[in-house]
């Protein structure tokens, strides 16, 4: 049986406790008589708050966009990182699946809290959407009342850990998000939404790669080499004091693969594409705001720049209609955004312009530093044809078809574009039938060209062109 005799060392403590209890019982009536009840309650409340106080908490709010419409890359990193921490036992979860994916993606919903432990401290993430924010926007002479949803992520933790969270945990989240993105990279294609004045995205699922790209092999190797050199020269650009960006001009007839080359570059570098439709941009200020909303490691694409919008150039005097408006989109504003001080607001950027008529472009747009590499996307040559035959008919380069010599003779010059050749190869899955049909088309097209050249006096063959400005 347990008794104090079994624990003689506790006897002094028991004796002291009994004495203390006796003293408290003796002075309690005295305290109740001398201290007013309100003061007693205050003292008891203060002691309870002191003994049972909870640590102060700090909450950091990470918005999806920051001032001037610039995308908050920390928000994107937080979203990616949190997606790996979602508790599947939560009460509410959001799910989605892209067309290119088999598995369902799980995201935490509004108000749901996700906990994380970092170096022994606990932090809590919470996703919020504010739908009450409204404002008036003046656009193209019209007033729009918008109610955009402002998305944000809240990060809460004990205030005493602020320095650790800001200097260590946040960089850790960003680095982990970058690794996750590289592992499951899903490229995005962004377009400008006039109604909400912001970029909206869809998944970029274009299958074009440099392996399947129907393009002159020498030209292809030159483009890939230039891209590789650009990516690894971050320190070089910083040392010489230039923004880390590169400009490419793709020019040539329709159907020569300009859009496919853009997709191949995006897939090669794992860069998102921002498709800028200049016709939807009202003035230079809107263009600056749009460019600030793009992210690093991305491609800014302006297709058919010669006919996308009637840019006012420095060689054209302003008309009376031009002076009526207080502002407009100008070539000068475009040049400032892609090559002026605004171009330094970001790293690892690629700007690509496409055009069918290079001669129509202002020379100021084509100079080195703006369009550093001019790539002529010409008609189909024999090397390009062999790539197309491999893609569409499964023919090997090492085992040429018996019609190859005749096709090589007929296809020289500006006869058919790669798109026209691909269309002929798609008409039949039998290689013999498809190539015989292509030979007939090539013969007919050459007769038409020879007749045209005889009437106009045009002669000579154009070779693939590539201009570098390093």
Curated annotation (Swiss-Prot):
Known cofactor(s): Mg(2+)
Signal peptide boundaries: 1-18
Sample GO molecular function, one term: ATP hydrolysis activity
Chain residues that bind ATP: 252-259
Catalytic activity entry: ATP + H2O = ADP + phosphate + H(+)
Keyword Repressor listed: no
UniProt entry keywords in alphabetical sequence: ATP-binding, Hydrolase, Magnesium, Nucleotide-binding, Signal
The keyword Endoplasmic reticulum is assigned to this record: no
Top-level enzyme category: hydrolase
InterPro entries, per database record: AAA+_ATPase, AAA_N_dom, ATPase_AAA_core, Mitochondrial_chaperone_BCS1, P-loop_NTPase
Catalytic activity, EC: 3.6.1.-
Domain of life: Eukaryota
Gene Ontology annotations of biological process type: response to stress
Any Pfam family matching the protein: AAA
The family this protein is said to belong to: Belongs to the AAA ATPase family. BCS1 subfamily.
Record protein name field: AAA-ATPase At5g17730
Organism annotation: Arabidopsis thaliana (Mouse-ear cress)
Lineage: Eukaryota, Viridiplantae, Streptophyta, Embryophyta, Tracheophyta
């Amino acid at each position: 049986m347990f008794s104090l005799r079994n624990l003689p060392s506790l006897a002094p403590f028991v004796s002291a406790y009994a004495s203390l209890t006796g003293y408290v019982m003796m002075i309690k009536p005295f305290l109740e008589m001398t201290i007013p009840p309100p003061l007693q309650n205050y003292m008891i409340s203060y002691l309870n708050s002191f003994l049972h106080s909870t640590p102060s908490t700090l909450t950091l709010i990470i918005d999806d966009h920051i001032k001037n419409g610039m995308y908050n890359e920390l928000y994107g990193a937080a979203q990616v990182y949190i997606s790996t921490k979602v508790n599947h036992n939560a009460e509410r979860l959001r799910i989605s699946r892209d067309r290119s994916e088999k598995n369902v993606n799980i995201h935490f919903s509004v108000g749901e809290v996700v906990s994380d432990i970092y170096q022994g401290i606990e932090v809590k993430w919470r996703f919020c959407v504010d739908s009450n924010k409204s404002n008036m926007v003046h656009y193209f002479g019209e007033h729009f009342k918008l109610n955009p949803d402002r998305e944000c992520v809240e990060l809460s933790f004990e205030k005493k850990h602020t320095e650790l969270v800001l200097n260590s945990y946040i960089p850790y989240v960003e680095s982990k998000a970058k690794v996750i993105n590289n592992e499951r990279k899903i490229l995005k294609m962004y377009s400008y939404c006039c109604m909400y004045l912001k970029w909206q995205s869809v998944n970029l699922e274009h299958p074009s790669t440099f392996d399947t790209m129907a393009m002159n092999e020498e030209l292809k190797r030159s483009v890939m080499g230039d891209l590789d050199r650009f990516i690894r020269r971050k320190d070089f650009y910083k040392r010489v004091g230039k923004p880390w960006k590169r400009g490419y001009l793709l020019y040539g007839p329709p159907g020569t693969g300009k859009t496919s080359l853009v997709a191949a570059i995006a897939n090669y570098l794992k860069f998102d594409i921002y498709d800028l439709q200049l016709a939807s941009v009202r003035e230079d200020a809107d263009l600056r705001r749009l460019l600030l909303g793009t992210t690093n490691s991305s491609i800014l694409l302006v297709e058919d720049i010669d006919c996308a919008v009637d840019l006012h150039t420095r060689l054209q005097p302003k008309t009376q209609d031009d002076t009526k408006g207080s502002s407009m989109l100008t070539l000068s504003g475009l040049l400032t955004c892609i090559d002026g001080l605004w171009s330094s607001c970001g790293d690892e950027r690629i700007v690509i312009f496409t055009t069918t008529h290079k001669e129509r472009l202002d020379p100021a747009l084509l100079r080195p530093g703006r369009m550093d590499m001019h790539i002529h996307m010409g008609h189909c040559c024999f090397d390009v044809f062999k790539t197309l035959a491999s893609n569409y008919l499964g023919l090997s380069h090492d085992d040429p078809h018996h019609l190859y010599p005749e096709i090589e003779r007929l296809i020289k010059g500006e006869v058919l574009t790669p798109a026209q050749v691909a269309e002929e190869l798609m008409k039949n899955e039998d290689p013999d039938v498809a190539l015989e049909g292509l030979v007939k088309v090539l013969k007919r097209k050459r007769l038409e060209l020879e007749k045209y050249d005889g009437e106009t006096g045009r002669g000579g063959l154009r070779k693939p062109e590539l201009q570098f400005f390093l």
